[in-house]
Every structure is written in structure tokens, then in C-alpha cells.
Design a protein with these regions (language model features):
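Transmembrane beta-barrel wall of Gram-negative outer-membrane proteins
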Residues: 103-105, 110-188, 214-217, 221, ...
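Extracytoplasmic beta-strand/coil segments of soluble accessory domains associated
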Residues: 6-52
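Flexible loop and strand-edge segments within Gram-negative outer membrane beta-barrel domains
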Residues: 175, 179-216, 268-272, 302-313
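Non-catalytic regulatory/gating segments with a bias toward low-complexity or hydrophobic composition
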Residues: 8-9, 70-75, 91-93, 134, ...
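N-terminal periplasmic accessory domains that precede
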Residues: 27-31, 45, 72, 85-107, ...
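Short acidic/polar hinge/loop motifs at secondary-structure boundaries
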Residues: 45-76, 94
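Outer-membrane beta-barrel translocator domains and adjoining extracellular loop/strand segments
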Residues: 60, 139, 144-152, 189-196, ...
């Protein structure tokens, strides 16, 4: 099944997801457009989750859980989505919404390399005008690459995520949604194989195993109005994305300092911190049977990024 954004490539023709040096920043390739960016930047494919724009590549290694359906709209979609400057298209993920009755499910998975996964979701009405949904995910996987100096398995991964949503229907035809979600990913750094110094593709020698720790929080307020003559949709969102990354740049087990040996080992570090506030408003025709349809929209975003990046010698 589809458990991450990267899994969409298994069911979507002419769409490929590939990893670079960071498991939480997969790159996309679609319609002959391939991303080569290293770091933070705009994507060739845009991503929306529950109407919230995920505008940079750092937001795309997320887990998908309690999803109702996923749409992929090929080509530029500036008419429908304000944040879409992506030429390749838009991935539109729609989570399941609470209904008139209580429903829920739980899942347990186990796989190779000690993979363990637990999923839980429940949704239903609190009152006649208020619904609630909760979903959560925990995933853990052991590493399968041996670091020869220590004998330990590296590149293990652990993730936990949760989302809480309230749906208010104060009076027809209004629907208001309040959403909060949080995700935590603790990943061992993807080992880079060096044919000159490593014993094989699954055996490496590193004095610093490396890690990638990622925290993401999202808060959103959505309001929808569906009238006889027009429809109105508003999405106000705040997202914070933080990452702490460390990797061995010299691809050896030589410790620091060894300058007297004529070799200086290098450790790469990066700590990006991104905050974004966005407001999107869409106004459209109300009757789908009319001979003409119209749409009008506005999008505003205020994005601030700080990044501490460099090398330790």
C-alpha cells in the first residue's frame, strides 16, 4: 500500500521518486522534468495535504496515514492551487474526514530488518454539529549496513506522527476544520558507499555514523462555503520544519585530529529551520450545471528559513 509520498510512484506512470543523501528530502521526476537540487528549494511537483501547501522539498519525506484519496494533476495547476509554481503537476492528498457515525481501525505490521509498524485512527461525531478525527502512526526499522569499526548496524529509522482534526458545521452551508499535526523522524544517515575505502555496498567504515533528525508541526484553519451562486474556500496554515543532520564527509574511520598524518577528516553538519505562514482563498461558481464556470483566487505566503551549515575538521 501507499504509506509514504514516495510510494505513489508504484501506481503512477511516468513518475519517479529517488533519494539523494537525505531520506526526508526525496527528489521527483515527472514528464521529463527531474530535480537536481541539493538542499532547500522549489520542486518540479507541488504537494498539498488537506488543502495545505507543502512548498519545499524538505516537506516531502512524510508518512501518509488515514488517507481518503490521492490525486495527481499533471502540468501547471495555477488555476486551481495558488502555491503551484511547479511545472510537473500537483500531488493532492485528502485525509479521511469524520462522518455521521463513529468508525476506527488499527493496524500492526512486521517486516524484514526488524521493521515494526503500528497505525491507529478513529473518527466520528461529538455532537450534531461537531466531528472529530484522530490518527497516529509509529514505525521502527533496524539498520542493515554494518559499520566495521564498531560492528554496529547503521541507517536505522524511527518515526512517530499524529493528527487531530475538529470539523464544525455551525450552520449550512458552512464547514470549518481545525487541524493540528506533528511528526518526528529519527533516521540514521544514509551511508554513502566508497569503493576505495569500503569493503562492500553494505559494509562501511565511518568514525561518525551520522544521523538525520526531523521535526514537523502544522496548524491549519479551513473554512468552506457552498452556496447557490458561488463557493468560497479559505485555508490558513502555519508550518514549522526543523532538521538536525550530521554525516561523515571523508568516508573513512580515521578519527580527529590527524592533521600530522597529512589527512584531515571532515564531518558535515546542517540544521535548517523553516517557518511558513500561508493564506489561500478561492472563489468559484456555485452551480456545476451552468454553461460557464469561473474561478478567482488569491494566495499569500510568508516564509522564513534559517540554516546553520558547514563542516567540522
Amino acid at each position: 500500500g501507499i504509506q509514504e509520498v514516495r510510494d505513489i510512484q508504484t501506481v503512477l506512470p511516468n513518475f519517479t521518486v529517488f533519494d539523494a543523501n537525505n531520506t526526508r528530502m526525496p527528489k521527483f521526476s515527472v514528464r521529463g522534468l527531474r530535480e537536481n537540487n541539493f538542499g532547500v528549494g522549489q520542486s518540479v511537483v507541488g504537494l498539498y495535504v488537506d488543502g495545505i501547501p507543502y512548498t519545499d522539498m524538505m516537506s516531502r519525506g512524510l508518512s501518509l496515514y488515514d488517507v481518503d484519496h490521492i490525486e495527481f494533476l499533471r502540468g501547471p495547476q495555477g488555476t486551481l492551487f495558488g502555491a503551484s509554481a511547479a511545472p510537473g503537476g500537483i500531488i493532492n492528498v485528502r485525509p479521511r474526514q469524520p462522518g455521521a457515525e463513529w468508525v476506527g481501525s488499527a493496524g500492526l505490521g512486521y517486516g524484514n530488518h526488524g521493521t515494526r509498524e503500528y497505525r491507529l485512527n478513529a473518527s466520528g461525531p461529538l455532537t450534531g454539529q461537531i466531528g472529530v478525527s484522530f490518527s497516529g502512526l509509529y514505525n521502527d526499522r533496524d539498520g542493515f549496513v554494518t559499520n566495521l569499526p564498531t560492528g554496529q548496524e547503521i541507517d536505522g529509522r524511527e518515526s512517530v506522527a499524529g493528527r487531530l482534526q475538529f470539523v464544525l458545521m455551525p450552520r449550512e452551508p458552512w464547514t470549518i476544520r481545525l487541524t493540528a499535526s506533528s511528526e518526528r523522524y529519527d533516521d540514521g544517515f544514509t551511508p554513502t558507499y566508497s569503493p576505495l575505502s569500503d569493503a562492500g555496498p553494505f559494509k562501511v567504515s565511518r568514525d561518525v555514523p551520522g544521523y538525520v533528525n526531523t521535526d514537523v508541526t502544522t496548524y491549519a484553519l479551513s473554512a468552506d462555503f457552498s452556496g447557490e451562486h458561488f463557493t468560497l474556500s479559505s485555508v490558513t496554515a502555519f508550518r514549522n520544519w526543523e532538521q538536525d543532520l550530521q554525516q561523515d564527509f571523508d568516508f573513512t574511520a580515521i578519527p580527529q585530529p590527524v592533521a600530522e598524518m597529512g589527512f584531515i577528516p571532515v564531518i558535515g553538519v546542517s540544521q535548517p529551520d523553516v517557518e511558513q505562514f500561508s493564506q489561500e482563498i478561492r472563489l468559484g461558481s456555485g452551480d456545476a450545471n451552468e454553461s460557464y464556470q469561473w474561478t478567482l483566487g488569491a494566495y499569500y505566503a510568508d516564509r522564513e528559513m534559517d540554516n546553520v551549515s558547514g563542516s567540522l575538521y
